[in-house]
Design a protein with these regions (language model features):
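Ligand/cofactor-recognition surfaces for anionic moieties
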Residues: 1-635
């Protein structure tokens, strides 16, 4: 993982914002001139659309507030970490990549950054974004110096220079020990040796798994027979603290935007919540419904129902679409949650203070955890989207219902419950998922848009309401946030997908890198197909970056022309379906480029040395099948 770095207009925008903040109180004439520059850059970078700049301007919003909103948007991108290419099996990071890797590991608990802040006379709890980013840069330089063998005290003096107020020798020694320990663990990795040993029937030593960038250095060295965790320790106490903050944050955001408390929150619950985040989302659900775990020796033995007077708000109902891996690996977590939901549903409380009971009394029952049929995986929606097997959003909603209406709990394992599932979805006020790391994001797999996007589309279709979609962020345990799905898509697209630094990393991997770029563009299309939360500007910029840029087009032509054809085809489909209101010049260029791509493909097919049999494929939707069956029954 590496820092995303700002690029092109985003970097200039950040610099102009910093200049404005310095000038606004001491040089009003310069500040006024910078206002025009900043406004132009906001439009140029697309940040203006994200923050509603036009509406702010029309409403007479003070420019200082405009700048604050712009700073938040830019910082969200700058603080994102991105993969530096892909991992090659058997290789360990060296040089600058090792520095980046170790910094990414130590960044989670903040010990190096916080030591830098203390030694420069600052406090992490009161530091602003710019100061925190400067401290992280210094932390990375300090790690690099230690890896090169420089004593930590001299390294700190050199890196911090005249900013240094006092050396913290104890902290520096601890940092050195941590850096050298991680370096030794990296060097001890033996992925190829373990693979060969396993193939020969040899013993492979066991080791823990998890997200190394969330403070789990014990995952190293790699090449071990990794195991997961004890599910009866989920959620941990640390995850409970984060989960309760998530619950209150999502409620507060909905209240701010809709002037009402949400009655029912639809959620996508993945196994990664258990394996990577120690059950933060499970803790969030507990907090929403008003129960808390009871631990004994670190294991969750039961739960306590929090009285309403202590809770201070109504109990929020939940409708959960869980992943197949969660179902098959961590069923004890499902049973624990199901027990809590059913007990809360049976409490003798006013329905207006217990929305689970309210909806149960209205006929939805008490099943709240749903997934695909036992023994199967997937959500159905991503398959329909990739096959273009849909005509309108209602088709995708029906696919989602058919695939995911199986209820799970203590006393039922995959009981088909379409009526209950539909009744619950119709009362959902918002949908929710969250990110826990920059190693994996909402463009990384079709399951994200298929499940969360499919859930959102189904809720909107059944409720006939424009239900919002939210995304939580617990990448930094000290800065838990909840934003809209549209904001999260913008963050990931700008920080990663359109970032020249990420693109160059992918290009190092040739055919595979080109294929992964295409796959992530396809995921952007999937989000738009299911939720319509992707800005037109994003599709414009994707087209400019990957299709219209001559250098990128040549890369695809040399390495993987089929990947670019897929990108072009999805973009054209987005336009034809009315999902993308394209810039006319961009659309014209796309169409011309796609004709060129078809020529590439035909040339490559000719190299096969034989005839190629084409064919016609007719894709039908569920509705078409019903109509055909009805017509035959009438015959």
């Amino acid at each position: 993982m590496t820092s995303s770095d700002l690029y092109a207009g985003l970097k200039e925008l950040e610099e102009q914002i910093a200049d404005y903040n310095r000038a606004k109180d001491v040089d009003r004439a310069r500040a006024h001139a910078l206002e025009h520059t900043i406004a132009d850059l906001l439009v140029q970078t697309g940040i203006a659309d994200e923050m509603g700049f036009r509406a702010m301007h029309e409403d007479g919003t003070p420019f200082e507030e405009v700048v604050a909103a712009a700073h938040t948007a830019v910082t969200r991108i700058a603080d994102t970490r991105i993969p530096d290419g892909m991992h090659i099996f058997g290789e360990v990071p060296e040089g600058e990549r090792r520095v980046e890797f170790i910094h990414a590991i130590m960044r989670y608990n903040g010990e190096v950054r916080d030591a830098v802040l203390r030694m420069t006379g600052h406090d992490a709890s009161t530091a602003d974004d710019a100061l925190l980013r400067d401290a992280e840069a210094a932390a990375k330089s300090l790690i690099a110096a230690i890896l090169e063998g420089e004593p930590p005290d001299r390294a700190a003096e050199r890196v911090l220079g005249d900013r240094l107020r006092r050396l913290d020798l104890e902290a520096l020694q601890k940092i050195q020990d941590g850096v050298l320990d991680l370096a030794a663990r990296i060097d001890d990795s033996d992925e190829i040796g373990s693979l060969l040993s396993g193939c020969a029937g040899g013993y492979i030593p066991p080791g823990p798994s998890g997200l190394i960038t969330r403070g789990k250095p014990e995952v190293l060295p790699t090449g071990r027979n990794f195991y997961s965790l004890d599910p009866f320790r989920i959620p941990t106490r640390a995850a409970w603290r984060i989960g309760t903050r998530l619950a209150e944050s999502v409620i507060q955001k909905y209240i701010e935007e809709h002037r009402a408390i949400p009655e029912n929150i639809g959620m996508y619950w993945m196994a990664s919540d258990v394996m990577w985040a120690d059950g933060e989302q499970l803790a969030q659900v507990f907090s929403l419904i008003g129960v808390e775990p009871v631990w004994t020796d670190g294991r969750v033995r039961s739960y306590r129902v929090v009285p309403l007077e202590e809770l201070g708000r109504p109990r929020i109902d939940v409708t959960i679409r869980m992943s197949g891996i969660l179902r098959d690996c961590f069923y004890s977590c499902i049973e624990l949650l199901d027990d809590a939901i059913r007990e809360v549903a049976g409490l003798d409380e006013p329905p207006e203070m217990n929305f689970i009971r309210k909806h149960a009394l209205e006929g939805s029952g008490t099943a709240r955890i749903f997934g695909s049929r036992p023994g199967t995986y997937g959500n159905g929606v991503s398959l329909a989207v990739y096959a273009s097997a849909w005509k309108e959003e209602a088709d995708l909603a029906e696919v989602f219902l058919r695939w995911n209406s199986y209820a799970y709990g203590r006393d039922n394992f995959g009981e088909e419950s379409p009526e209950t599932f539909s009744a619950q979805l119709a009362t959902v006020d918002l949908t929710f998922n969250k990110t826990v790391t920059d190693e994996y994001d909402l463009l990384g797999c079709c399951c994200y848009f298929g499940a969360h996007g499919g859930l959102t589309g189904a809720v909107r279709a059944l409720s006939n309401r424009d239900v919002p979609a939210y995304y939580g962020d617990t990448r930094d345990r000290d800065r838990v946030e909840v934003r809209t799905l549209a904001e999260e898509i913008r963050r990931v697209v700008r920080a990663k997908l359109l970032n020249p630094k990420w693109i160059e990393g992918m290009k190092r991997h040739g055919y595979k890198g080109a294929g992964d770029i295409s796959r992530q563009v396809g995921t952007v299309y999937g989000w738009e197909a299911t939720t319509q939360e992707v800005d037109d500007r994003i599709f414009d910029d994707i087209t400019r970056t990957f299709v219209l840029d001559a250098e990128m087009r040549q890369f695809f032509a040399d390495e993987n022309p089929w990947a670019l054809e897929e990108i072009g085809r999805r973009l054209l489909e987005a336009h034809e379906r009315g999902l993308w209101d394209a810039d006319p010049d961009v659309l014209e260029g796309l169409r011309a480029a796609y004709l060129e791509m078809e020529g590439w493909i035909e040339d490559r097919m000719g190299d096969a040395g034989g005839d190629v049999q084409g064919g016609a494929v007719r894709v039908v939707t569920v509705g078409d099948v019903k109509a055909l069956r009805g017509a035959r029954e009438k015959e």
